[in-house]
Amino acid sequence: MKLQIQSVIYGNQVDALVKAMKALQQAVKVYHRRVGDLQVRLIYGDSTPTPVLDEKTQKDIREMLKAEIEFEYKVFGFNSGTAKGHNLMAENTDADIMMIMNPDVILEPTCLCKLMELLKLKEVGMVEARQTP
C-alpha cells in the first residue's frame, strides 16, 4: 500500500520541520513492526518567497528518512495557499491513500496504525486524528 503525506510550508523553522519528520518516521517504524508493508512518500510544498530548505538540508533529510520514507520537496515559486498547494502536490500521485498534515504536527507513535485500521472499514472514506496541544 502507498501512502502520500503532504504538508504546505511557509517560512517554517527547519528544526521544527525536522522534529515533525522524526515523529512521522517513528510512526512509520511502528506501523512496519505491527502491521506490515507501507510505502510512504512525504512531500513538502513550499510557498515561501525564499525556499525554507536549502540543497544540503534536503539531502540531510533524505538521508535521515531514507529507510522508511521517500522525501520530496517542491518549491511553488508563489504563495499557493493551503488548498492550492495540496492540490498541486496531489496532482500526479499514485498513492492509495493521501494524508494531509500540518507541518508542525508531532504524531503519536501508533497514529498511523490507528488511522489506517479505520480506513479498512468499507463504510469509512476519511479519517482525522484528534489534535491536542
What are these regions (language model features)?
Residues 7, 42-46, 128-130:
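Short beta-strand segments
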Residues 75-93:
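Glycine-rich, basic loop-to-helix element that forms the pyrophosphate-binding segment
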Residues 98:
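Short aromatic/hydrophobic "clamp" motif used to bind/position activated sugar donors
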Residues 1-38:
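N-proximal low-complexity "stem/linker" segments adjacent to membrane-targeting elements
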Residues 24-74:
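Acidic donor-binding segment of Leloir-type glycosyltransferases
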Residues 109-133:
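Conserved donor NDP-sugar-binding/catalytic core segment of glycosyltransferases
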Residues 102-106:
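The conserved acidic donor/metal-binding loop of glycosyltransferases
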